[in-house]
Amino acid sequence: MKLRVLSLMVPALLVAGTAGAAEIYNKDGNKLDLYGKVDGLHYFSSNNGVDGDQSYMRFGLRGETQISDQLTGYGQWEYQANLNHAENQDNKNFTRYGFAGLKFGDYGSFDYGRNTGVLYDVAAYTDLQPEFDGMTYGADQFMFQRSSGLATYRNNDFFGLVDGLNFALQYQGKNGNGEETNNGRDVLGQNGEGYGMSMSYDMGYGISAAGAFFNSRRTSEQNGANGHQNIMGRGDKAEGYSGGLKYDANDVYLAVMFTQSYNAARFGSSDSSVYGYANKAQSFEAYAHYQFDFGLRPFVGYNQTKGKDLGRAGNGKDYGDQDLVKFVDLGATYFFNKNMSTYVDYKINLVDNNDFTDAAGINTDNVVAVGLVYQF
């Protein structure tokens, strides 16, 4: 389950559940909160590479300082510690968020660091399943989700003039290999310089709409340099365009999201025989839940990304159009109180097993996730 983080004064990032953070310090205009969760999580699947313990902990700090009547400073850091490896092994722990910024009253906020890309302002509408949510994109994938080197300006209620009209402008610096930037990374996590924008409007009666786009340069390795001559999906630019609609009222939540992207939807891994980016991809997500008064929240979701015109791989095969992600998600969460919950999340995989999925390492088996969560 993804913890929706609240960037102080940046409400596009959401907090999951109803648990509040623990206040560490609050004096003379300075505040510091600690938040987090522990998820005792197990996967059940016939795929041995997925089946087993998936437990983890997330925790973070967020703070603010009142500089003047109209100027507030803020910052946030969040970390994930995986709990399913031996103590003498690399647990692959990592920082999810880390940024600092300034809020200028009704004139908006500006921050820089590791944060969320503007396309997630739309994707957040459907990214709500307790475990298998937001599967049509991933971290460090241009400006789809969490990424590094993001400078973000956000404005809520359009300078205080139009209630419910919010927008964001974003720039991302280059994150290349070790020879191009100081934070070298795998080819499927790289990006060139890019920019994006999002806009949302709360129309009242529980109805909201949002749209976003990004345009980024791609790196030389993403176009076949330095031993990546077999990577698929060449192109100078990566682009994404997304729109979403949601209804959230009377204990009912309904949302849909559609994204069209070019040279940006990734598949495989750099050590698989088939990997790279779809020349064109269409992603669709839908999600619905009902919240009962006694704590039960049943839900249903659907995720699909269709890669179009994938082209010829390094193994000489032309793969044409392929499903990169396609599944129905069913389950329920039960909230004991604001700090404790449990859930079952059943991913019914609709991707057909074929030569492409085998070569790209795409799982085609069903997965059941069972979790017990404490959050604060």
From Swiss-Prot:
Forms pores that allow passive diffusion of small molecules across the outer membrane. One of its GO terms (cellular component) is pore complex. It is a multi-pass membrane protein. Keywords: Cell outer membrane, Ion transport, Membrane, Porin, Signal, Transmembrane, Transmembrane beta strand, Transport. The gene is ompC. This is Outer membrane porin C. Homotrimer. It comes from the Bacteria. It comes from Serratia marcescens. Residues 1-21 form the signal peptide. CDD domains: gram_neg_porins (cd00342). One of its GO terms (molecular function) is porin activity. Belongs to the Gram-negative porin family. GO terms for biological process: monoatomic ion transmembrane transport.
